[in-house]
A protein has these predicted regions:
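A conserved beta-strand-loop-helix scaffold within acyl/acetyltransferase catalytic domains
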Residues: 3-77, 164-188
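Conserved residues at beta->alpha junctions
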Residues: 5, 112, 148
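Conserved acetyl-CoA-binding loop-helix of GNAT-fold acetyltransferases
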Residues: 76-79, 85-98
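Conserved GNAT acetyl-CoA-binding A-motif
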Residues: 93, 100-113
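Conserved functional hotspot residues or short segments at active or partner-binding sites
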Residues: 116
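Thiolate-centered catalytic microenvironments shared by cysteine-dependent enzyme domains
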Residues: 119
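Amide-forming acyltransferase catalytic core, primarily the GNAT-like/NAT-type
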Residues: 124-188
Length: 188
């Protein structure tokens, strides 16, 4: 088994692994690879020519007022189901950390989707910081105007609102990817 950076020739295998690991639609998978993948650094574990695990480092900043640090947001970390429980993901993330440190990233960030994943990443040395939870149900009835925003407009509004709070500053490519899934809106 070897660990390496991904390349364009890996795309068919990476997309298949993504579908298997997350169950996303073809449209969602294609959106990531068309919009975010070109600015990301992909890492994979390969065995006998087959990609069996992958993770993508999206360059970001963690900002707080005038202060910021470079972070690599580890996104879509997955291992083929036939190869889980063998320590492959831990080794892949260690390889990614080593490579990203060479590129002068100050830290790595993750957003685990479940408590089980949070515990798993904690076992690898990741620590939780100011966790936010979202409740998509029970929102009050909309009042006023709902205005669609471009990714650039959303980025400006987000920076204005979060300026004095620690927050991730997303790249325009990542915001375009998010917008392709749901869009950005301002309520007035």
């Amino acid at each position: 088994m070897r660990f390496r950076k991904t390349n364009p020739g890996d795309l068919p295998q990476l997309k298949s692994l993504w579908a298997l690991g997350f169950g996303d639609t073809e449209q969602e998978i294609e959106a990531f690879f068309a919009i975010s993948y070109p600015t990301a650094t992909g890492f994979c574990a390969e065995e006998d020519g087959k990609v069996i695990a992958a993770a993508y480092a999206l360059p970001q900043e963690v900002a707080w007022g005038e202060k910021n640090c470079r972070t690599a947001y580890l996104y879509a970390v997955t291992t083929h189901p036939d190869f889980r429980k063998r320590g492959i993901c831990a080794k892949l993330l260690a390889y990614a950390e080593k490579e990203l440190t060479k590129r002068y990233f100050d830290c790595l960030t993750l957003v685990p989707a479940t408590d089980a994943l949070r515990s798993y990443y904690a076992s690898l040395g990741f620590v939780s910081q100011n966790t936010a939870f979202f409740d998509e149900g029970g929102a009050p009835e909309a009042r006023g105007v709902c205005e669609a925003l471009s990714p650039t407009e959303y980025a400006g509004l987000r920076e204005t609102v979060l300026y004095d709070a620690p927050h991730a500053r997303y790249s325009l490519a990542d915001l375009r990817y998010q917008a392709s899934m749901s869009g950005f809106y301002r309520l007035e």
